From Swiss-Prot:
Residues 49-59, 256-274 have a biased composition (Basic residues). One of its GO terms (molecular function) is structural constituent of ribosome. It comes from Acidithiobacillus ferrooxidans (strain ATCC 23270 / DSM 14882 / CIP 104768 / NCIMB 8455). The keyword Membrane does not apply. Gene3D superfamilies: 2.30.30.30, Nucleic acid-binding proteins (2.40.50.140), Ribosomal protein L2, domain 3 (4.10.950.10). This is Large ribosomal subunit protein uL2. Residues 40-59, 223-274 are annotated as: Disordered. One of its GO terms (biological process) is cytoplasmic translation. Part of the 50S ribosomal subunit. Forms a bridge to the 30S subunit in the 70S ribosome.
Length: 274
């Protein structure tokens, strides 16, 4: 893994900084583990925009990634590492001894030929998966389930990880990157190590077109709109909006708490720092 700054042969390449990983597979993905992906451009069945800033972008197939890691007690081996256009992390193609192949998130330090195992008790090596009850306190993990058997939901992006802080009865305490400490049942599974491609955040796309290739459309400021389109719109000449920053639907956007799931609030031991 290396960061490469391109030569300024054009204005669009002057500020490009990209990551290069020579270990990645250069061919097509495993055909049995891909699905056709349809893009809606952010529109619903009526053709109206329901998700702003979406549309265009390069066509891509969806890679079926195994977040549940429920193939238990069957050893596997990393066959190859691959690029995935649908996420910031790289993925690893695992070939199990029974012949089945699955994609998993590529952990930091994982390389071709490494053994991988998902079981109730496994060696503490990057890529191995086990319930939180068997992971030593202080370990760094990723792809953590929030409900047993549902599949990993926490720490799945490039370079992400959480730390197992303590275990009390049926619950473990995990410290997230945001500083939040959360209680999760010890039957939930997690993968050892942190997610690979940790230099993803240091890249620079260099031009607006590279963002459009990824299916992201421009963001228009509210103060540049008309009053019918945004609460900040209108006014004679350039104005500051005349009110505290809000979304197009009038909800405060800076510092306003929007979390409404009181049912799981008791699972949060310490809030993230604001």
């Amino acid at each position: 893994m290396a960061l490469i700054k391109t030569k300024p042969t054009s204005a669009g390449r002057r500020f490009v900084v990209k990551t290069i990983d020579t270990r990645l597979h250069k061919g097509n993905p495993h055909s049995a583990l891909v699905e056709v992906q349809s893009h809606s451009g952010g529109r619903n069945n009526l053709g109206r925009v329901t998700r702003r800033h979406q549309g265009g972008g390069h066509k891509s197939h969806y890679r079926l990634v195994d977040f549940k890691r429920n193939k238990l007690d069957i050893p596997g081996k990393v066959e190859r590492l691959e690029y995935d256009p649908n996420r910031s992390a790289h993925i690893a193609l695992i070939c199990y001894v029974d012949g089945e192949r699955r994609y998993i998130l590529a952990a930091k330090g994982m390389s071709v030929g490494d053994p991988v195992l998902s079981a109730e008790q496994t060696p503490i090596k990057p890529g191995n998966c086990m319930p939180l009850r068997g992971i030593p306190v202080g370990s760094v993990v990723h792809n953590v389930e929030m409900r047993p058997g549902k599949g990993g939901q926490i720490a799945r992006s490039a370079g992400a990880s959480v730390q197992l802080m303590a275990r009390e009865g049926d619950y473990a305490q995990l410290r997230l990157r945001s500083g939040e400490v959360r209680r999760i049942h010890v039957s939930c599974r997690a993968t050892i190590g942190e997610v690979g491609n940790e230099e993803h955040g240091s890249r620079q796309l260099g031009k607006a077109g590279a963002t459009r290739w990824r299916g992201v459309r421009p963001t228009v400021r509210g103060v540049a709109m008309n009053p019918v389109d945004h609460p900040h719109g209108g006014g004679e000449g350039r104005t500051s909006g005349g009110r505290h920053p809000v979304s197009p639907w009038g909800q405060p956007t800076k510092g306003y708490r929007t979390r409404r799931n009181k049912r799981t609030s008791n699972m949060i031991v310490r809030r993230r720092s604001r």
